[in-house]
Amino acid sequence: MAERDHYHTIDDPNVPCNFYDTVNLTGHTVFPNGSYDYYGTIVPAELVGTYDYIHSSLTERIEVREHVRGCVCKFKSCLNICCPWRQVFNSEVDGCIIDHSDNRTWPDPPMLNITFRNDSTILVNMFAQFAIQSFRPCPKMFSLQPETSHWDDYLLFENGSMLRVDDQQLIRKNEFCMVPTYVNESDMFYTIHPANCDMQDDNSTVKIINAYAMMFSIPFMMLTIAVYLLIPELRNQHGKSLVCYLVGLTVGYTSLCYVQLYQVDATGDACKVFGYTAYFFFMGAYMWLSVISFDLWHNFRGTRGINRFQEKKRFLFYSLYSWGIAVVFLAFTYIAQELTNLPAYLKPGIGDGVYCWLDMSNWAAMIYFYGPILVIVVANTIMFIMTAIKIHGVQREMARIIASENSTKNLRTEKDKFGLFLRLFLIMGITWLTELISYFVGSDKGWSKLFYISDLANAMQGFLIFMLFVMKKKVKHLITNRCSSVRDGSNQRQSQYSTKTTSSSVANLSLHEKPSVEKPLVISSSVDPQKTTIFR
């Protein structure tokens, strides 16, 4: 709050009022007594001053030629518009322009619902009710459109301030501006709504923390992938599925980290590339999670867990299923964003000039991301429950009969796998389920703070998976054996190379020596010929 107050108080002491309470009087009628007529509002001489600067944003002051400004907001409520009336902001020129190709109708006069001190709400003429300022508080503005989402509901007050309903944030008049908006491309008229800044708040802070947590997590996922690829005993069906799952998470995390930490231009092609890449690999990862759940259930479906297909064919089928469905989701999302005229609140939002990732402020995230993941989590839960029931049934059956040693060992092995991947499911399923809940209550700042911990845990999944799948006793033993075998193999190869080199040297030497015929080689009878090595 102190920083926001700073925006309202800092200014030149030689001017009659703060810049944000002024309007530019250049070109307006001046009276002999020094007062000015500003669109029918008389600005007294004592509230007129010469300014040699402007504020191009809330934080940036620019020196300009001296010009006259009047403190009209000192005696009349002001309302800020982002661009002069009938002009729109153009990102290519980074300024306001008159768009002659735009055929939409501007409201004349613009009517706004204003809430007064007595809590009454009245539809008023914007130009009659307020003195109009034109100022863009920050480079990136986000318009509120209550027609598309109740999270965009707001209240405009008679003093020119605004209440953002979803988080009950009171926004001062110079921290937002009114902008012409439309819902559908086919709309032929503008509606005037406020646009607010992407201010640094608790939510953006959490995004930064999550990004660094993901960076911390990525090396652990890569280590887990390396361990499961390099150790033959771990390259079974479940191990290969885990590797594919981690590949999806690693690429997805890397893409999101780059977007969040390096501030990728939301209007550029790189934004779309990172956004769609992250989406594809995240969806692929969750399809592999469903594969793991299905394969565990499949192994317990029969009393002896007999596989129907050879492991290689089954892995190929699983790969086509997981990555294939991820491609289908990617195509569906891309078409919805790039090739349709859907309303903005039904588009994914990837690379739309505002977001590189999905738009989390409306139902788009539910349709294209959280919805499919919710289905996967529910399906995984059902399969895990069915597998647990089957394990319990097999245990009871084996307790009633004399089980063979192999059957008991196989059951124990499958139980270990089930327990391991059950913990993986708990890490992934429950964490993402809490994130789904946080998505629904995210507009309520009081509730959403409860999910900051789950968001952080979600971002640190790589570390948790590394501890679960690599730091277990059996895997560490396999790593030790693998390192020992590699070291022994290296020593053995070195020894063989040394032996061959020595043999070759002696052989070469014998070619240059004259054979001794006077003194033939004699082996002493005291030496066992079977244990004697002879180099000629």
UniProtKB/Swiss-Prot annotation:
Subcellular location per the Swiss-Prot or TrEMBL entry: Cell membrane
UniProt topological domain (Extracellular) ranges: 1-210, 263-273, 336-365, 439-449
SUPFAM superfamilies the UniProt entry points to: Family A G protein-coupled receptor-like, Methuselah ectodomain
Keywords assigned by UniProt, alphabetized: Cell membrane, Disulfide bond, G-protein coupled receptor, Glycoprotein, Membrane, Receptor, Signal, Transducer, Transmembrane, Transmembrane helix
Residue ranges that the UniProt entry lists as topological domain Cytoplasmic: 232-241, 295-314, 387-417, 471-536
GO cellular component: a single term: plasma membrane
Effect in UniProt of substituting residue 526 to N: In strain: Yak_4 and Yak_8
Family: Belongs to the G-protein coupled receptor 2 family. Mth subfamily.
Name this protein carries in UniProt: G-protein coupled receptor Mth2
Native source species: Drosophila yakuba (Fruit fly)
